[in-house]
Regions:
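Residue-level recognition of well-ordered beta-strand positions that form the cores
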Residues: 37, 131-133, 146-150, 165-169, ...
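Boundary at the C-terminal end of the N-terminal hydrophobic targeting segment
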Residues: 11-13
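Short beta-strand segments
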Residues: 40, 141-145, 175
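Extended, loop-rich substrate-binding clefts of extracytoplasmic carbohydrate-active enzymes
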Residues: 83-159
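Acidic (Asp/Glu-rich), glycine- and aromatic
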Residues: 42-45, 53-55, 155-191
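Bacterial N-terminal signal peptides
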Residues: 1-8
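Extracellular structured ligand-interaction cores
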Residues: 27-29, 59-61, 125-129, 146, ...
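Beta-strand-rich N-terminal accessory domains
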Residues: 15-86, 165, 174
Length: 191
């Protein structure tokens, strides 16, 4: 088990207002709002009904929005390197039961949100705790992940602090995580 991976991120902005809230758009995404403006959107939908929809939803990630709450400043589905999405976690060289898996480029399996263990918000910040399973090619879980994303406001010149941590637990066999710095761990991909 990897106890924690932590990735703090400070987002520049003009408004350090208070008043966080969380709103779930069931089976699609969860929004974190600050004074009525979207600051983050956790994209957790999983839909394997068509190849295109599966490609769009094969891993959960956190979008970060501009100071007006209108547009993501992080990359989403599509464009060049479609696997680069917001704030996400993965490895391109995973060994499990004698086979190699890629949960970076997402070939031969997915990372699937199972449920929220906790969502909360108050005047100081918001927190999302998500349980995910990292599947093999047969949709059998290899890894159980508890992903925690904490969002709070900070002093100027920044607007937000985002802490991303993950607890990973091997299921059924040992797991070896490997990859180069560009294809392993927690990453932030701007739009």
């Amino acid at each position: 088990m990897i106890p924690h991976l932590l990735c703090p991120l400070l987002i520049n902005g003009q408004n350090a207002a208070t008043g966080f809230s969380v709103e779930d758009r069931t089976n699609e995404y969860l929004e974190v709002m600050l004074d009525g403006r979207i600051v983050c959107r956790y994209m957790y939908a999983y839909d394997n009904s068509t190849p295109d929809r599966l490609h769009e939803t094969y891993k959960p990630y956190l979008h970060v929005f501009d100071a007006d709450g209108e547009r993501p400043i992080t990359k989403g589905f599509g464009g060049h390197f479609t696997h680069h999405r917001g704030i996400f976690i993965g490895w391109n060289k995973i060994q499990f039961k004698g086979k190699s898996y890629d949960r970076w480029h997402m070939t031969g399996g997915e990372i699937v949100h199972q449920k929220f263990l906790d969502t909360r918000a108050n005047s100081d910040g918001a927190e999302i705790v998500s349980l995910t399973h990292w599947h093999d090619e047969n949709q059998v879980p290899m890894i159980e992940e508890i992903r925690t994303m904490s969002i709070s406001h900070v002093s100027q010149p920044f607007r937000l602090r985002i802490d991303f941590s993950a607890q990973l637990k091997a299921l059924g066999s040992d797991v070896f995580l490997d990859g180069d710095p560009e294809h392993a761990g927690v990453q932030y991909r701007p739009a």
